[in-house]
Structures are given as C-alpha cells and as structure tokens.
Amino acid sequence: IRDSATLSYYDPETKTVENEVFYRANAMKLGDVAQSMTIRNDVGWVVVNNSHVIFAIDINTFKEVGRITGLTSPRYIHFISDEKAYVTQIWDYRIFIVNPKTYQITGYIECPDMTMETGSTEQMVQYGKYVYVNCWSYQKRILKIDTTTDQVVDQLEVGIQPTSLVMDKNYKLWTITDGGYEGSPYGYEEPVSYTHLRAHETELHL
C-alpha cells in the first residue's frame, strides 16, 4: 500500500503514544516503507525506502526541515560528520554520500562484485575512521570502508544474507544471517537451532 508509512512518538514519562505525528505536523504522508530513523543534533532523519527519500524533521515539532531526494532505495543513514553521511541502498551497487547540511548527494562508494540487480548494503557501524556495512539481499559479505577516502578497503565473507550488524562494548562485530531461501540462485543455508560462533576464528581486522 503506497503512502502507508507513519511515525509515532512514545513518551516514557507518561507512557503514552502519539500516532501520525509526521502527518499532523506536515499535512502529508511519509510515503512507502519508513525503513529506519536516526537522530542527530535534535534532527530526526527518516529513511523512506520505496519512496526514495530521506526526511529531516525537528524532533520537538516533527516538522520537516529538509529532505534528500534522488536516492535509489535507501535503507540506513550513518553520519561521518556534520557535512558528510553515508546512505546504504538496496537494488544498487553504490553507497550514496550525502551532505546533511545541503541535503545534496555529493558522491558514491562503489561496492565490489555487485550489480544493480544484486546490490544491497544495509546497517553501518563505525570504529575509528572505518565504517563496516553488512551486505544483505543476495550477498554474504561485510565491507570495510575508509571514511577518509570513501573507498572499500577490505571485506569479509560470512553466512548468506547478513541482515544486521552491531558492535559490542569490546569492539567486536556481530551479525545475523537469514540464510536466503530454498531455490535461490545465490545460495541457501538451512536454519539450525543452535550455533556457537567463534568470533576469533573468523576475523576482520579493525
């Protein structure tokens, strides 16, 4: 359903929920599939996947203060600085570089061994000057990006279709893979009830 995405606000003090806060503040719908939201400096960045847009909103009034357009199918935004952020995509072999101050696309990071049909980058975490990103749909890799050059400098093969990526307090990366689906030309891994992951045996040097 198009324009089905909504934004709600939960107040932990009163334990109440306000629905449709974006629509009520801006008199327009968010669009189709609000995939993720990141807050930075009192601005919320709402990534709307199928509508190819990122809305910047004031988190106190929920009013739009800007938007980034011209994206393929955005998934997540990660801020490198006040003037540079990365936006991951599905159905694209590139990670977009944007300027949050001007809301403009300023460049691209080309991901190796991807096409427009098989391209997929998802969540991002940062350690020092490096950003790590899991490649989800039809992929099985984690990429390492140097933020000073905006280039992929290393990669690690993991299980099929890593869906998420986090870094723990000991600076270790953890990912979850969904294994694809039976009959997929890109591979399939049967689910198991228990897996012991020895992180020290499969390592991507930070």
Predicted regions span which residues?
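Short loop/turn segments that connect beta-strands within beta-propeller blades
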Residues: E13, D58-T61, N99-Y103, D146-D150
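Residue-level detector of Asp-centered blade-edge/turn motifs that repeat once per structural unit
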Residues: I39-N41, I80-D82, Q126-G128, D168-N170
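A short beta-strand motif characteristic of beta-propeller blades
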Residues: V17-M28, K63-I68, Q104-M114, Q151-L156, ...
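Conserved small/polar residues in nucleotide/adenosyl-binding loops
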Residues: T195-T202
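Structural motif
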Residues: D3-T6, F96, K140-L143, G183-Y194
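Conserved beta-strand positions in repeat-built beta-propeller and related beta-rich domains
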Residues: I1-D3, W45-N50, V87-W91, V133-S137, ...
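Repeated scaffold domains used in trafficking and secretory/extracellular systems
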Residues: D32-S36, S73-H78, T118-Q123, I160-D168
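Asp-box/WD-like beta-propeller blade repeats and closely related beta-sheet repeat scaffolds
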Residues: G70-I80, T88-F96, P100, I105-V125
